[in-house]
Amino acid sequence: MEKSKNIWSLILTEIKKELSEEEFYVWFENLCFLESIGDNIKISTPNLFHKNQIEKRFTKKIKEILIKNGYNNIVIVFTNQPPKTHSNKQETKNPALNETFSKFDKLKEKTTSKEAIQNIQDRIKMYIKKEEEEPTNFKNPFLKKRYTFENFIIGPNNKLAYNASLSISKNPGKKYNPCLIYGGVGLGKTHLLQSIGNKTEELHHNLKILYVTAENFLNEFVESIKTHETKKFKKKYRYLDMLLIDDIHDLQKKEGIQEELFHTFNALYEDNKQLVFTCDRSPSELTNFTDRLKSRFTRGLNVDISKPNFELRAAIVEKKAEEDGINVPKNILNLVAQKVTTNVRDLEAAVTKLKAYIDLDNIEIDIEIVEKIIKEIIIYEKETTNEPNNKINIENIKKILLRELKITHKDIEGHSKKPEITKARHIYAYLLRNFTELSTVEIGKIIGGKTHSTVLYSINKIDRDRNNDKEINNLITELMNKIKKN
């Protein structure tokens, strides 16, 4: 115990050399040695806010001091647990406030500078005020632990979104801020968004992270207006370190909540706090959304998730079957992957139905049963989406593109470097990616033998241009509408 106290005294001595008198008294005067357990030395702080600030500001420096003096295995653990000799007597309703301001008696004895004392007093009042305003006992009830990066299956359709999400978790607020992940229903947007929250919580224990659906965000806002607690609503969302909002498209046509989101966005963004959103379409395709809010979404990274190709669908089906303990021939699973082309959710639903047949009916799965299950899922999908039942024909896409842009087959499949022809190829690649399940390699073969990277560049370029160029956005929207109608 005595050795641990000496180590803590050493740390204080070294820290004091590098801080001004005022800073040292603000952060270290009220710390108290609590106990030592093995290599852990526990230090008591006056309150939770003080604990968080000490960890944030000085953990790295303390570690350097320990290593420098040969205490490589020693870990300093800060806690707001009071010392064992701590009196429960409270001078006011806020004991933390009493403890914090008691430091001024000592400070006054050691300095004659009234200005220095006043400066510190003002700063501490500000910290205490912030502590009282910030939400305490922060909980994140909507994060589901089952969503992780480890059980997310990666393929060419979602790799960029996956890598960006993982990077955000490791360094929130640094890169890709804000980030908007967009794509159709059941493709894994929620899985990635929840994984960001879970991984960030695992790596950064002190951060306040909140996942919420756009619908719940709206409902909370409406309720706060009804109960005259809008101030409480603002505090909840503007003191976060990371805000994750799912299905942002649900806020279309709702001007009041868009206004609130705009101000919440600004408050967090200007304080380098991480924002991540999901949407069923790119920002340029959002309707009844204020331009200034849409412009905020495009400040950072916009990344899409498209429908999975066969290889990824097969991997998803196999993993789901393994998780559910289903032992069926691989050709059965491949048939599911081949026929269910809509999204991840439908693939998993098909495997769940297979399990039900096995567990409840105790029958052997054959091709006939699989085809029956697939038929049920495909019919349900057609009834519950606005997508056309017939697959959009590649030739129809090309026909409409050539007609509207007034170019020829030779132009689109050739090697002309004319700007208008190059632009047409970019658009063709973008349309094929959005209306078909073709991979970038397959699209490249259709457009005159272009490489994967060339096709990917074309798709990303049009996506960026739609955000920045109104004329291009209008052209693409018009082409897409004509293709859908055709």
Curated annotation (Swiss-Prot):
SUBUNIT field: Oligomerizes as a right-handed, spiral filament on DNA at oriC.
Region entry Domain III, AAA+ region, spans: 142-358
Gene Ontology BP annotations: DNA replication initiation; regulation of DNA replication
S-S bridge residues: none
Region: Domain I, interacts with DnaA modulators, residue numbers: 1-79
Entry text on domains: Domain I is involved in oligomerization and binding regulators, domain II is flexibile and of varying length in different bacteria, domain III forms the AAA+ region, while domain IV binds dsDNA.
Species annotation: Borreliella burgdorferi (strain ATCC 35210 / DSM 4680 / CIP 102532 / B31)
Lineage, uppermost ranks: Bacteria, Pseudomonadati, Spirochaetota, Spirochaetia, Spirochaetales
UniProt keyword annotation of Cytoplasm present: yes
Molecular function via GO: ATP binding; ATP hydrolysis activity; DNA replication origin binding; lipid binding
Domain II, as annotated region: 79-141
Originating gene: dnaA
Keyword Nucleotide-binding: yes
Name of the protein: Chromosomal replication initiator protein DnaA
Family per record: Belongs to the DnaA family.
